[in-house]
């Protein structure tokens, strides 16, 4: 048998040897959650039932590919309710809207379909209940996010936004006999939220915790899955849009959990090949509003660059589904 030293390997043999050590760890769960699946299907079914155009207030979910695909099918996305013509069909996005927006739509005789995620609706109901019971509400979330605007709009006079640890000291004083509770946006980093809540408790000794967790199961599951692959990954690529809160949180979680680097991309072609320089293990995940076809595109991109060994790391199984708005459910026979 003829033995060949490493420096005598042919170019193709050297490439094969290098590729043999390259691997991809794919986080699971990833991608679509039950709320996003319901919201996207709401628009699809509305187009089937009523025909184009169907108007959608804001992006139905925060994903460029999904929005563009639905627009090609006849959905028209508008920033404000008043941009939809009187009497049109209008879908409210998965992020929810305030009572003022509902009234605005009613005044325009719009035929509304509410695609708000049921887990967001749960937080809306908590705000209404605690406001009715005389509480001040500290809402942990990101200023300007549609979900936060809709949730705070349920009781704007008693809801105070907490956008980061640094904002805790900017909150007004609350007397000890004033009832005080914190709630949160559903798509936040679990670890960051707990850091903020710890600071809130330090400042307000009488602050109450909510009866149940507001950060949704899908957000938590995707963060746990990313943590499971991050420490072994030279780089973690998260598929998701820049305006997606939960996708951006996955990048942050990956870095905090030990990834060498982490990047957010909408499409595989946005990956800078320099990110892979020297990398032997690449982690891949996707936000809750990302269809699996975009993840497959990233895996194909990596495969073409020698990352042939693909292993899925599963930390939870998701079986939750949500019913469509009543007007779009199949008729009972």
From Swiss-Prot:
| Family annotation (CDD domains) | lytB_ispH
- Residues bound to isopentenyl diphosphate: 62, 95, 145, 244-246, 289
Q: How is the cofactor bound?
A: Binds 1 [4Fe-4S] cluster per subunit.
**Which reaction(s) does its UniProt entry say it catalyses?**
isopentenyl diphosphate + 2 oxidized [2Fe-2S]-[ferredoxin] + H2O = (2E)-4-hydroxy-3-methylbut-2-enyl diphosphate + 2 reduced [2Fe-2S]-[ferredoxin] + 2 H(+); dimethylallyl diphosphate + 2 oxidized [2Fe-2S]-[ferredoxin] + H2O = (2E)-4-hydroxy-3-methylbut-2-enyl diphosphate + 2 reduced [2Fe-2S]-[ferredoxin] + 2 H(+)
Give GO BP annotations, semicolon-separated.
dimethylallyl diphosphate biosynthetic process; isopentenyl diphosphate biosynthetic process, methylerythritol 4-phosphate pathway; terpenoid biosynthetic process
| Keywords, alphabetical | 4Fe-4S, Iron, Iron-sulfur, Isoprene biosynthesis, Metal-binding, Oxidoreductase
Catalytic residues as annotated in Swiss-Prot or TrEMBL: 147
Q: What is its EC number?
A: 1.17.7.4
Its cofactor is: [4Fe-4S] cluster
Please name every pair of cysteines joined by a disulfide bond in this record: none
InterPro entries for the chain:
LytB/IspH
Residues that hold (2E)-4-hydroxy-3-methylbut-2-enyl diphosphate according to the record: 62, 95, 145, 186, 244-246, 289
Supply the enzyme class, top level. Answer: oxidoreductase
Is Transmembrane one of the keywords?
no
**Which residues take part in binding dimethylallyl diphosphate?**
62, 95, 145, 244-246, 289
Q: Give residues annotated as binding [4Fe-4S] cluster.
A: 33, 117, 216
- What pathway annotation does it carry? Isoprenoid biosynthesis; dimethylallyl diphosphate biosynthesis; dimethylallyl diphosphate from (2E)-4-hydroxy-3-methylbutenyl diphosphate: step 1/1; Isoprenoid biosynthesis; isopentenyl diphosphate biosynthesis via DXP pathway; isopentenyl diphosphate from 1-deoxy-D-xylulose 5-phosphate: step 6/6
Q: Which family does it belong to?
A: Belongs to the IspH family.
Q: What does this protein do?
A: Catalyzes the conversion of 1-hydroxy-2-methyl-2-(E)-butenyl 4-diphosphate (HMBPP) into a mixture of isopentenyl diphosphate (IPP) and dimethylallyl diphosphate (DMAPP). Acts in the terminal step of the DOXP/MEP pathway for isoprenoid precursor biosynthesis.
This protein's name: 4-hydroxy-3-methylbut-2-enyl diphosphate reductase
Species this protein is from: Corynebacterium diphtheriae (strain ATCC 700971 / NCTC 13129 / Biotype gravis)
């Amino acid at each position: 048998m003829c033995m060949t030293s490493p420096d005598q390997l042919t170019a193709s043999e050297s490439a094969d040897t290098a590729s043999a050590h390259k691997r991809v760890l794919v986080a699971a769960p990833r991608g679509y959650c039950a709320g996003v699946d319901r919201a996207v299907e709401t628009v699809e079914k509305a187009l089937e039932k009523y025909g184009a155009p169907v108007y959608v207030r804001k992006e139905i979910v925060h994903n460029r590919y999904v929005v563009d695909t639905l627009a090609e099918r006849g959905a028209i996305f508008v920033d404000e309710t008043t941009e939809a013509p009187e009497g049109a069909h209008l879908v409210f996005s998965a992020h929810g809207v305030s009572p003022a927006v509902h009234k605005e739509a009613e005044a325009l005789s719009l035929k509304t379909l509410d695609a708000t995620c049921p887990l967001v609706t749960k937080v809306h109901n908590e705000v209404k209940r605690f406001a009715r019971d005389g509480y001040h509400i500290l809402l942990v979330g990101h200023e300007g996010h549609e979900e936060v605007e809709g949730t705070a709009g349920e009781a704007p006079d008693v809801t105070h936004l907490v956008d980061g640890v640094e904002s805790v000291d900017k909150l007004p004083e609350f007397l000890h006999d004033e009832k005080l509770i914190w709630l949160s946006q559903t798509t936040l980093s679990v670890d960051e939220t707990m850091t903020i809540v710890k600071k809130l408790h330090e400042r307000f000794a009488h602050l109450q915790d909510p009866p149940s967790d507001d950060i949704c199961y899908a957000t938590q599951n995707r963060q746990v899955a990313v943590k499971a692959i991050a420490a072994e990954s030279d780089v973690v690529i998260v598929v998701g849009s820049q305006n997606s809160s939960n996708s951006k949180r996955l990048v942050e979680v990956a870095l905090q959990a030990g990834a060498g680097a982490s990047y957010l991309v909408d499409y595989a072609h946005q990956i800078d090949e320099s990110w892979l320089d020297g990398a032997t293990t690449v982690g891949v995940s996707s936000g809750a509003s990302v269809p699996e076809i975009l993840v497959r595109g990233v895996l194909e991109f990596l495969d073409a660059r020698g990352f042939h060994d693909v292993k899925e790391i599963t930390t939870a199984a998701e079986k939750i589904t949500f019913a469509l708005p009543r007007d779009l459910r199949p008729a009972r026979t």
